[in-house]
Amino acid sequence: MLISVPATSANLGPGFDTLGLAVDLRNEIVIKPSKFLSLSTHGEGADNPKIKKNSLFLSIFNENYKRLSGKANNFRFEFTNRIPISRGLGSSSAVIVAALSGAYAMAGVKYNKREILNQALRYEHHPDNITPAVMGGFNVACVEGDRVYSKKRRMPDYLRAVVVVPNRTISTARSRTVLPKMYRKEETVYSLSRAAYMTALFMSESWDLLRIASKDKLHQARRMKMMPELFDVQKLALKQGALMSTLSGSGSTFFNLAYEKDTDRIAQSLRARFPQFRVFVLALDNNGVITK
């Protein structure tokens, strides 16, 4: 059994804990029945003893496999990690979604993606990463009780993500400590109006107005101050033709959306200016989690 989950970029500027989309950079897990527990890890984090334990995956998989009355006692898990870890590209959400999908598949229980998404909410209380990880595409999502309500828009083939991955992390926990407990009404309205406008632009494919819609006053600049180079990343990407340039999740990765014809120029400029950072040019993903 192969489980494949895409990386995701959440918030997209003003859509704090609400908006997200999937990009074609995938973690894969092969699961096979075995006489004893066996783990192998390749790619991102393969040299990190904590990552190699895959504790979060195993905890969620075992809990749900047991809940679903699975019969096998042990499995061999082969992890291929391509999503940078703790960089704001949804690596934790990918683990959660993969573990749940794997538990259902190996237990032989039929399920739909909405069920996986609602189960994922038990482990990740914000829907902005888990929703595109499950569904693919661009998603606007909210939580009511123990359910995620979301709307998906498929992304066109002529757009690409230019993703800048810094050489150090900004932890989600730390990044939340820099946010105020209270916001001024003007800040809230500024970002709320742009999140609504951005959603309309994505749904209508009005890409050339995203530069206005992607501005934010709630979280982005406050978090970027923890890594000031990110202001220069954003400025250069927009100068070179990015449609929008936003902090990915809580960082430290920066997400840039662009027309395919502009991506080489944007990526080359970013690589030349920031040689210490990794730059990926990625297709956008419309499939979400895949089980086969």
UniProtKB/Swiss-Prot annotation:
GO terms for cellular component: cytoplasm. It holds the Pfam family GHMP_kinases_N. Its EC number is 2.7.1.39. It is found in: Cytoplasm. ATP binds at P84, I85, S86, R87, G88, L89, G90, S91, S92, S93, A94. Keywords: Amino-acid biosynthesis, ATP-binding, Cytoplasm, Kinase, Nucleotide-binding, Threonine biosynthesis, Transferase. Pathway: Amino-acid biosynthesis; L-threonine biosynthesis; L-threonine from L-aspartate: step 4/5. GO terms for biological process: threonine biosynthetic process. It is an enzyme of class 2 (transferase). InterPro entries: GHMP_kinase_C_dom, GHMP_kinase_C_sf, GHMP_kinase_N_dom, GHMP_knse_ATP-bd_CS, Homoserine_kinase, Ribosomal_Su5_D2-typ_SF, Ribsml_uS5_D2-typ_fold_subgr. GO terms for molecular function: ATP binding; homoserine kinase activity. It catalyses: L-homoserine + ATP = O-phospho-L-homoserine + ADP + H(+). Its main location: cytoplasm. Catalyzes the ATP-dependent phosphorylation of L-homoserine to L-homoserine phosphate. PANTHER family: HOMOSERINE KINASE, HOMOSERINE/4-DIPHOSPHOCYTIDYL-2-C-METHYL-D-ERYTHRITOL KINASE. Belongs to the GHMP kinase family. Homoserine kinase subfamily. This is Homoserine kinase. It comes from Sulfurovum sp. (strain NBC37-1).
